[in-house]
From Swiss-Prot:
Cofactor(s) needed for function: Zn(2+)
Gene from which the chain derives: tgt
Native organism taxonomy: Bacteria, Bacillati, Cyanobacteriota, Cyanophyceae, Synechococcales
Pfam families: TGT
Record text on cofactor binding: Binds 1 zinc ion per subunit.
Binding site residues for Zn(2+): 303, 305, 308, 334
Family listed: Belongs to the queuine tRNA-ribosyltransferase family.
Binding site for substrate: 92-96, 146, 188, 215
Top EC category: transferase
Reactions it catalyzes: 7-aminomethyl-7-carbaguanine + guanosine(34) in tRNA = 7-aminomethyl-7-carbaguanosine(34) in tRNA + guanine
Name of this chain's protein: Queuine tRNA-ribosyltransferase
Annotated TM spans: none
GO cellular component annotations of the record: cytosol
Length: 372
């Protein structure tokens, strides 16, 4: 039911193309995955999302547990039917909220007690509970519960959190019983190579359908992020899909692909879109700026997204300056399409054996726009 098929390999790097087969369709990798935290990519309908070329989205277990609740989603027929998205869905475990809501939680080896940011009540999540929630949601891919520590934690604290992550992985595997849902484990270990290696080997030993690398892009320096991207894949199984969590910049994606990663997610396309910022090549355009008032060109004349085919920078500037919701939607749509197009172009370059010429971030200060 779940299979990862490697379809081509780069001759100079570890980059590869593949097909991740799921019960709700296939994901052609490398692929960017938009974030739909509450079973919605903010401001965008499922039909609009399909137009961007998106093949898989991410939703958040913790937030869906709080509202509307996994039982209601299950009663509706599962998350795909609930949100009218027929393609694959991955649900993260809530491990990131262990990091992002650190001031509102208490952590023990049994799980995490959160203070509900909505009403102040307390919610306890154990690895077993997190898996049960994801089984009720009915996602294609469930993530094992993990402890994502802050990048400022010292090595001893990182090691303690890693042991907890590994213990929770064991419990997650023992609890997960849904044959039509894949379970991925998560590699942690902070910026410490020995801990990353240990975690990668331990997580790989479970022979799960896929594997993720977490604890990246949580405040580290660019150099530290690149170190993890370069180092960890050598300890991961080659024939499994590799998911690098929280990465969405062109340079980091291309570097990650060169090291054998396949799937990526990030909130930036929609977060920036909601603030009027559009992706253009490897730059960002703040369309609130007055210089776009009389600019009747599209965001990107080479882009075939619905926004760029139909609307000018001047019109988008007008919408954003007047706080019109349509502006946020149109820019977010473009930003998602931009990253999907980028990963699609990487796939083509790998198949044509020109990936290192067109997308190698270590060879140029910017990624050549004409290549995609």
């Amino acid at each position: 039911m779940f299979e990862f098929e490697i379809t081509s390999n780069c001759s100079n790097t570890a980059a590869r193309t593949g097909i991740f087969h799921t019960p709700n369709g296939q994901v052609n990798t490398p692929k960017f995955m938009p974030v739909g935290t509450l079973a919605t990519v903010k401001g965008i309908s499922s039909k609009q999302l399909t137009s961007t070329g998106s093949e898989m989205i991410l939703s958040n277990t913790f937030h869906l547990h709080l509202q509307p609740g996994e039982k209601l989603v299950k009663e509706s027929g599962g998350i795909h039917k609930f949100m009218n998205w027929p393609k694959p869905i991955l649900t993260d475990s809530g491990g990131y909220q262990v990091f992002s809501l650190a001031k509102l939680n208490n952590i023990s080896d049994k799980g995490v007690e959160f203070k509900n940011p909505r009403d102040g009540s307390y919610v306890f999540l154990s690895p077993e509970k997190v898996i049960q929630i994801q089984m009720d949601l009915g996602s294609d891919v469930a993530m094992a519960f993990d402890h994502c520590p802050p990048h400022t934690a010292n090595e001893n604290d990182i090691e303690d959190s890693l042991q907890r992550t590994h213990s929770w992985l064991q419990k997650s595997v023992e609890t997960h019983q849904k044959s039509n849902q894949a379970l991925f484990g998560i590699v942690q270990g902070g910026k410490y190579p020995k801990l990353r290696e240990y975690s990668a080997k331990y997580t790989s030993s479970f022979d799960l359908p896929g594997i993720a690398v977490g604890g990246v892009s949580v405040g580290e320096t660019v150099e530290e992020i690149h170190s993890v991207i370069n180092y960890v894949p050598k300890f991961l199984p080659i024939k499994k899909p590799r998911y690098l969590m929280g990465i969405g910049s062109l340079k980091e994606i291309s570097l990650a692909v060169a090291n054998g990663f396949d799937i990526f997610d990030c909130v930036l396309p929609t977060r920036l879109g909601r603030h009027g910022t559009a992706f253009f090549n490897d730059e960002r355009l703040n369309l609130r700026n007055a210089r776009f008032k009389n600019d009747f060109s599209p965001i990107d004349k080479t882009c075939k997204c619905e926004t760029c085919k139909s609307y000018s920078r001047a019109y988008l500037h007008h919408l954003i300056r007047n706080d019109e919701i349509l502006g946020l939607t149109l820019i977010s749509l473009h930003n998602i399409a931009h990253l999907i197009r980028f990963t699609n172009a990487i796939s083509t370059a790998i198949r044509d054996n020109c990936f290192t010429n067109d997308f190698a971030p270590w060879k140029t200060s910017s990624i050549a726009h004409h290549t995609w």
